[in-house]
Amino acid sequence: YREWDGEGRMTGYCYDERGNLTSVIHPDGTEETRAYDEEDRLITETDALGNRRVLVYHEPSQDGTPVNGEGQLSAVIEADDRATFFEYDTHGLLSSVSLDDRTVHLEYNEQNNLVSVKNEKGVGTRWNYDHKGNVLSVLTSAGAKQTFRYDRLNRVTSITTGKRTTNLRYNSYEDVV
């Protein structure tokens, strides 16, 4: 597939037989490439400067025992060999992200809504939800708080940050007016 910009420069796109984007050739001749595994998951990508990124996925156990995060991204290795690691809980939800010596932990409620993101020192953000899954409030470790109100159609009607409140109204097309 090819497309031309307003100045007549062409960008080319190549796909494999399964419809995965495998390369982009830019007007300046530089190329980005991507490779996929047999499950169509991205496993490598190389940017136009030649920087390669490798993506690694959790594989199923050999004995059929469930593995947290099975089939999900487990690591991204950048061109400079820095790696980001991902762990998952028993529901397959992301539970931690680690880069260098830093780790961020994520927690969820029974409805699988994200309720907490914090680093190893406990610094982070908390979310509270109503029974419909709407965010009621967001509270940071620094004490900043945002609250949200909703109408019967679950549309946000007000957002309060500190002492400032922004009210929202909607037209018949669901656009904010």
Spans of model-derived segments:
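Beta-strand elements of repeat-based all-beta scaffolds
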Residues: 1-5, 9-26, 30-47, 51-78, ...
